[in-house]
């Protein structure tokens, strides 16, 4: 009997630890997200956020979101629908922004539906436009080409325009360094598996706002 209780307790502890680990997994874009094309940037959120219908503390409260590294409330939204980037070991917890004013940001709080609401800024420097976000993290850690991106995203152009000459292609990149962003084009230096350096322009974002490349945040300390 005692032996049975012991094995039951061990099994229960193992099950709990397994579930907890599943909740705490890292979140980072791996494919282009069509629901986020209207977003204008990112905001680093704290672990207790009140979401309002309007940028006014007297307006309707839509949700109060709270999270730890292992749990998220409310569960009907969850980690993956709320965050664009969630890397707790690197202190990164970012949501996408659709609008802002001096004191508030409108965030997309459910990436699966595109639902939005307003949160009050607790620090004005936590908001970054997409250009600032890429200049900060993309230049420092490089870029990765998201899965399922159009084939033409592998084309390296001589100038930041569709009709420019294709001077090379991205095949099996070891590193994609971001040099500068010009509109929806990025000047990059690519080191492929054959160790051949390639420099030119790639289409990092469509005219509709779909992002094909994303900073290599896994590389940040």
Tell what function each PLM region has:
Residues 1-9:
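Bacterial N-terminal signal peptides that target proteins for export
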Residues 4-5, 176-181, 220:
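Residue-level detector of intrinsically disordered/flexible regions characterized by low predicted structural confidence
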Residues 8-18:
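Bacterial N-terminal signal peptides
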Residues 19-24:
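Sec/Tat signal peptide C-region and signal peptidase I cleavage site
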Residues 25-147, 165, 189-221:
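Boundary regions of SH3-family modules and the immediately adjacent low-complexity/disordered segments
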Residues 139-197:
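Intrinsically disordered, low-complexity segments enriched in Gly and acidic/Ser/Thr residues
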């Amino acid at each position: 009997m005692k032996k049975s209780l012991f094995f039951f307790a061990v099994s229960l502890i193992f099950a709990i630890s397994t579930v907890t680990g599943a909740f705490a997994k890292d979140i980072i874009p791996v494919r282009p997200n069509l629901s986020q094309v209207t977003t204008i940037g990112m905001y680093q959120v704290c672990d207790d956020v009140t979401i309002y219908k309007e940028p006014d503390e007297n307006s309707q409260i839509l949700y109060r979101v709270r999270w730890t590294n292992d749990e998220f409330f409310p569960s009907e939204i969850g980690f993956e629908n709320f965050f664009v980037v969630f890397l707790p070991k690197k202190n990164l917890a970012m949501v996408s922004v659709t609008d802002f004013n001096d004191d508030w940001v409108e965030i997309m709080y459910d990436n699966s539906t595109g639902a939005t609401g307003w949160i009050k800024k607790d620090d004005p420097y936590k908001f970054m436009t997409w250009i600032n976000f890429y200049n900060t993290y993309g230049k420092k850690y490089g870029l990765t080409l998201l899965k399922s991106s159009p084939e033409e995203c592998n084309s390296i152009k001589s100038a930041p325009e569709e009709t420019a000459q294709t001077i090379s292609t991205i095949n099996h990149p070891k590193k994609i360094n971001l040099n500068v962003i010009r509109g929806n084009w990025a000047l990059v230096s690519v080191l492929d598996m054959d160790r051949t350096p390639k420099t030119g322009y790639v289409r990092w974002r469509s005219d509709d706002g779909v992002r094909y490349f994303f900073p290599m945040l896994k590389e940040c300390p």
